[in-house]
């Protein structure tokens, strides 16, 4: 049976899983977080969208999960020579893509989703990729040092400031791209990938139309936690800041606050955290160290999806 899968993704954990789905030629689309989008030296930067695009094009830097593999940094280095403090280290090919997207949006009048689709086609990607919204929604980390854009908090401050809370500015007025809505409505299953719940998936669910559709769909969820620690990134600190334990139990409780309940929860086989009752749980090795691991986990996800609705 040819089942349609829509994946909710941020920029690190879930792209590793997308790599496996890509290798298996699965039928899926992706809705991507844009809460970290920013403008840097005149460029429109959409880090999570770009990582997903690079992953599906087979050119992602899979050591950092940001940017393009084997990219150079002569542009960044020359900016340093000019005395320009570029807050994000952008590679040369990566910069070219960002420049092209900025041109499409500013000069050609394309919406973000239209620009992303144009780039997707030019990169030869057959899977549809949608930003969660064409409107500006910004993830703000509320800290003891003031309100910080997520880039400021994580890249510039190293995630060190004590966190009081997280909010998604502009989410109440934002709407998803119509094509993303259509894709989500056609999906047989929604897969919530192992991205940071608070700053990757939370912004997507903060868009009310997306949230309401996801609530009505079968949901498979992959935990980004092993024990009480995330596999990578600041998810633990941010989960605690918004009132949840950084564990698979806290993950379920966090998504329940959004009204989203997993039909199947995939968690790591080494994880012994006690879970809420009534959950259908599959335990497997969720750690994706390389492409082989990504394919293995993706194959398991597809098996679960087929059992759920096939």
Curated annotation (Swiss-Prot):
It comes from the Archaea. It catalyses: (2S)-lactyl-2-diphospho-5'-guanosine + 7,8-didemethyl-8-hydroxy-5-deazariboflavin = oxidized coenzyme F420-0 + GMP + H(+). The keyword Transferase applies. Its cofactor is Mg(2+). Pathway: Cofactor biosynthesis; coenzyme F420 biosynthesis. Keywords: Magnesium, Transferase. The gene is cofD. InterPro entries: CofD, CofD-like_dom_sf, FbiA/CofD. It is an enzyme of class 2 (transferase). GO terms for molecular function: LPPG:FO 2-phospho-L-lactate transferase activity; magnesium ion binding. This is 2-phospho-L-lactate transferase. Homodimer. Belongs to the CofD family. Its EC number is 2.7.8.28. Catalyzes the transfer of the 2-phospholactate moiety from (2S)-lactyl-2-diphospho-5'-guanosine to 7,8-didemethyl-8-hydroxy-5-deazariboflavin (FO) with the formation of oxidized coenzyme F420-0 and GMP.
